Amino acid sequence: MTKTPPAPEPDVLFGATDERQFIPQQQTPAAAPAPAEDAHYHGHRDRLRARYREYGDAALADYEILELILFRLIPRRDTKPIAKALLARFGTLAGVFGAPLHLLHEVKGVKESVALDLKLVATASHRMLKSELRNKQVLSSWSAVIDYCHAAMAHETKEQFRILFLDKRNTLIADEVQQQGTIDHTPVYPREVVKRALELSATALILVHNHPSGDPTPSCADIEMTKLIAEAAKPLGIALHDHVIIGKDGHVSLKGLQLF
């Protein structure tokens, strides 16, 4: 009886053929598991988005609102430390969005593109608030005026002098920044203010400037400058309705204090 010879052992060398001309298929190595850190922040992002979708902003802390914005700006990094660092540096969401670009850059993890996008959010907010003043009598929408001016100016690091030009119905014609000054002074020239009002056919003005210190208390120079502008405008039929000083801590109306 003839014995069947044993089958040859397969070649142990990768890629070599056995006697049956069989080429072993190369095994694709299993994908490495995602780092635990990646899995952590992706899961956190999903949970935070779900909470916002279901409950709205009332369910989120300020740093979590910032996180939601930073998710798209910084797609592959844990943004919670950056959001908390921004709030620690600038105090509030308004402070973060109102901060100048060069100060935003000083926060670790905030590159130029991120800082620009944060400022874009602030710009959209300002435009939204300003749109509330269009085609409305400004004096009857005073809270909207204050909200807009506070958003636009309260967190500026230098003094800024802004004028709201109104027509005879007290509707906003133009909103212009006339001067940028130092941290505690802005040069203002009454004749230039009146000249611009005449160019726009404005019949009334509201002056607004900020105090970067945060304290909106008017200085003697603020009061004197207001009186000079009122005196220059009055003979030309231009009324000065108010001069509002904006600070991080609130605002002051010189008209309300009967200072001119």
From Swiss-Prot:
The record's section on CDD domains has: MPN_DUF2466 (cd08071)
Q: Which InterPro entries match?
A: MPN, RadC_JAB, RuvA_2-like, UPF0758, UPF0758_CS
UniProt motif JAMM motif: location: 209-222
Domain (MPN): give its ranges.
138-260
The residues listed in the UniProt record as binding Zn(2+), with positions renumbered to this chain, are 209, 211, 222
Q: Which GO terms describe its molecular function?
A: metal ion binding; metallopeptidase activity
Which cysteine pairs make disulfide bonds?
Answer: none
Q: Name one GO biological process term.
A: proteolysis
- Which UniProt keyword terms apply here? Hydrolase, Metal-binding, Metalloprotease, Protease, Zinc
Q: Give the family per the record.
A: Belongs to the UPF0758 family.
Protein name per UniProt? UPF0758 protein Smed_1459
